[in-house]
């Protein structure tokens, strides 16, 4: 049974790869068609396009890394190839996490209602705020790349001094663990920011519901519905990102103790996040949902 597990996990990874490419490609295609036809695009749609493109890159990185790890081919990659592979993973993962976090901030500033002068100032300049945050995240990306480059340089120096097979395998596993740990630490910041946005949205919704009760109005007013929809999107991101984060953390520990089965399971769970969250974004967006249902109806009619 255990010998069949790599094949089973590989099939799941391939399925996630296909779903992820289809869902993210759909987001890019529909928004680009809308952009061309209307000659303009909202800020949230632009965010969705960039997020979807970054996730397509991440999904491809996951697939390539999976097969390299499965056949222990990573240690045969040259220094330049190793840098390209790891750096492209870091860049795609960085924008994948931060753009989803920025989307949460966008919903917070657009939907939430607070009397704080600072919040109102940010709310009036939401597009500039989003742009500044996006540019600010490049600092984290730059620091992450510097740290990883130091780890790569250190490993390559040791590899050139001792090229025996046993040393290469064990030292590469140590190097891989260090890279994963560094990436995990840099992933904590966007998760924390998204979680704070979620708490503020919940607090804003609670205040709004209390106000509705005082005014003897029902909870089905448009503002409540907008709050609820935004919360669903942010909650789905947080839950899936938490599973992604935990899978990276556990795979890091399992790789440290050389538990291959747990490592493969965590990698499979981690790949579920960039594939499934984009599908949930389609269902949570009125334009994308309508286009998806239209395409699904046409496909079903041809059967």
Curated annotation (Swiss-Prot):
Protein name: Taste receptor type 2 member 13
Record gene name: TAS2R13
Cytoplasmic side: 29-55, 107-128, 206-232, 283-303
Extra information: Most taste cells may be activated by a limited number of bitter compounds; individual taste cells can discriminate among bitter stimuli.
Pfam family, one: TAS2R
Lyase recorded as keyword: no
GO aspect biological process, one term: detection of chemical stimulus involved in sensory perception of bitter taste
Keyword entries, A-Z: G-protein coupled receptor, Glycoprotein, Membrane, Receptor, Sensory transduction, Taste, Transducer, Transmembrane, Transmembrane helix
Organism placement in taxonomy: Eukaryota, Metazoa, Chordata, Craniata, Vertebrata
Highest taxon of the lineage: Eukaryota
């Amino acid at each position: 049974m255990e010998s069949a597990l790599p094949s089973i996990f590989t099939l799941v990874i391939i399925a996630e790869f296909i779903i992820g490419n289809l869902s993210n490609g759909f987001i890019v295609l529909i928004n680009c068609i809308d952009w061309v036809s209307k000659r303009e695009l909202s800020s949230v749609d632009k965010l969705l396009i960039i997020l979807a493109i970054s996730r397509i890159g991440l999904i491809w990185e996951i697939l390539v890394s999976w097969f390299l790890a499965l056949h222990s081919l990573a240690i045969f990659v040259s220094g330049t190839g190793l840098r390209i592979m790891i750096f492209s993973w870091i860049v795609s993962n960085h924008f994948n996490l931060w753009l989803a976090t920025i989307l949460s901030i966008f919903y917070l500033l657009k939907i939430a209602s607070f009397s704080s002068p600072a919040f109102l100032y940010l709310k009036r300049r939401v597009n500039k705020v989003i742009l500044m945050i996006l540019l600010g995240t490049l600092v984290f990306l730059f620091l992450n790349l510097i740290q990883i480059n130091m780890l790569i340089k250190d490993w390559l120096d040791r590899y050139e001094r001792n090229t025996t097979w046993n040393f290469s395998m064990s030292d590469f596993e140590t190097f891989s663990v260090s890279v994963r740990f560094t990436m995990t630490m840099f992933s904590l910041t966007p998760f924390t920011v998204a979680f704070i946005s979620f708490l503020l949205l919940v607090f804003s919704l609670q205040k709004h519901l209390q106000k509705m009760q005082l005014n003897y109005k029902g909870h089905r007013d448009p503002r409540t519905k907008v709050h609820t929809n935004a919360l669903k999107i942010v909650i789905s991101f947080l839950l899936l990102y938490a599973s992604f984060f935990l899978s990276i953390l556990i795979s890091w520990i399992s790789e440290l103790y050389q538990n291959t089965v747990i490592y493969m399971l965590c990698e499979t769970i981690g790949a579920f996040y960039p594939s499934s969250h984009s599908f949930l974004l389609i269902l949570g967006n009125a334009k994308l949902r309508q286009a998806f249902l239209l395409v699904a109806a046409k496909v079903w009619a041809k059967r």
